[in-house]
Amino acid sequence: MSREAFDVPNIGTNKFLKVTPNLFTPERLNLFDDVELYLTLIKASKCVEQGERLHNISWRILNKAVLKEHNINRSKKRDGVKNIYYVLNPNNKQPIKPKQAAVKQPPLQKANLPPTTAKQNVLTRPMTSPAIAQGAHDRSLDNPNSTNNDVKNDVAPNRQFSKSTTSGLFSNFADKYQKMKNVNHVANKEEPQTIITGFDTSTVITKKPLQSRRSRSPFQHIGDMNMNCIDNETSKSTSPTLENMGSRKSSFPQKESLFGRPRSYKNDQNGQLSLSKTSSRKGKNKIFFSSEDEDSDWDSVSNDSEFYADEDDEEYDDYNEEEADQYYRRQWDKLLFAKNQQNLDSTKSSVSSANTINSNTSHDPVRKSLLSGLFLSEANSNSNNHNTAHSEYASKHVSPTPQSSHSNIGPQPQQNPPSANGIKQQKPSLKTSNVTALASLSPPQPSNNERLSMDIQKDFKTDNESNHLYESNAPLTAQTILPTALSTHMFLPNNIHQQRMAIATGSNTRHRFSRRQSMDIPSKNRNTGFLKTRMEISEEEKMVRTISRLDNTSIANSNGNGNDDTSNQRTEALGRKTSNGGRI
């Protein structure tokens, strides 16, 4: 740092040096790009005010240039001016120059304008209705207070700006800062194009007439034509339904929708009811709101609501709903009556019950519903099932009688009177002939059961018998649930099933050979507890063959010597088996 950069009023041991503000003038700002300035601050840190902070800041700026930018000669003006200025002038308590105060006065004068001059540029439109004019006169008494409050709120931030003081070493930075501050914080409010000074809540907001304003909305030109067409269609559609209900109800209450036009029910000269629409648009106060563009197609209150409301009212009218409810109620009563009539007539005869239901349904001249005939079909199916079941039951319980090959011999079969259920039963009578034989009531029919072998039939019989062999100590619920589960979704293991079959039939199980087991195929019999080698398995198979052969020979030989020989051979084979087990 050069000598002129320091202000040395008194040189002494108890005095400290101070960095002069002239360092921040535009002529000397280029010194912040030089490394010599920062090195001088580092060396003179012990005898300069805020020397430690200047020392640290200087080192930080140099290290940033070397390590981050990899160039110590890079421009360090921004970091140096910003950091060193805030160290030397931390509080900003210097007074503002007169030039800066003069710069700040124009926005304050602009903000202090009276509210009347600020409101002169706003376009206002008077109200034509006397009720709205009266509401405007009543509300105008409260407006001065509200407008004064708004002006005070707008001027308050500007006064705060005037009270805040900033100190700078050069005026151009402070002027630019203050101008930017005023631009950022002064809110330019956009006033609406149309202001209504008073508004009465009791007035009805409607659309402005078509001839009084200019618009390009397609609904305005076509709306009246559509309304006339809709009136004609509704008068045609509702006339037949009203004729049906004219004898029951003479008058209907007048209903009015929220947006649609009210309508009243009137009697014509012929005594028929008809719908008539009454227009209630006359005598209402009208307020027209437009957007910022006078030629815009959109209005805040549109006539489309009336157009669609009329359609909704005509489509979903209460009268039509009542008629539909009564129609479906009559249909439901007919179905219930048909079901009850079917139950009553079934005691007499099935044919007569079907005829009565057909006659009851044929008398109705009104259109049929989708549910018509539901109970009729169910009743017919139930009666047919009942007839077939009863005939099968009667045929099973009739005692078998002898039949003859000659049908013309003997008395004719007698017919019994009809039973309580209206079904005629025919019992076969005795027929006398030369040749008599007992036969089944139904002729034999070829079936697939003949193809089954006798072995399969025997197995089926043993399976049915084995189901009732077990005895359980379980409670009654388990005794009833377990057989059902076994017959539906539970299956017994094969070995247990085979054991029960063997016990039931008493067959010899010694001739049954188990599957070959080895080291590769683990044994399913877990009673042994160890695995066998192939040699042991082959020896056991040989032993089983010899035992079976000896048993067969023992049956053939009935003398005592033969029995002794076979017993000796069997003991020798068993001795070899036990010796092999002892080795393992």
UniProtKB/Swiss-Prot annotation:
Residues 307-320 have a biased composition (Acidic residues). The modification Phosphoserine is found at S247, S276, S442, S518. One of its GO terms (biological process) is mitochondria-nucleus signaling pathway. It is found in: Nucleus. One of its GO terms (cellular component) is nucleus. Keywords: Nucleus, Phosphoprotein, Repressor, Transcription, Transcription regulation. InterPro entries: AreA_GATA, Ras-cAMP_regulatory. The keyword rRNA-binding does not apply. Residues 95-167, 209-279, 291-320, 343-366, 381-432, 551-584 are annotated as: Disordered. Residues 114-127, 229-254, 267-278, 343-363, 398-432 have a biased composition (Polar residues). The modification Phosphothreonine is found at T25. Residues 381-392, 557-568 have a biased composition (Low complexity). Negative regulator of Ras-cAMP pathway. Involved in transcriptional regulation of galactose-inducible genes. This is Negative regulator of RAS-cAMP pathway. It comes from Saccharomyces cerevisiae (strain ATCC 204508 / S288c) (Baker's yeast). The lineage of its organism: Eukaryota, Fungi, Dikarya, Ascomycota, Saccharomycotina.
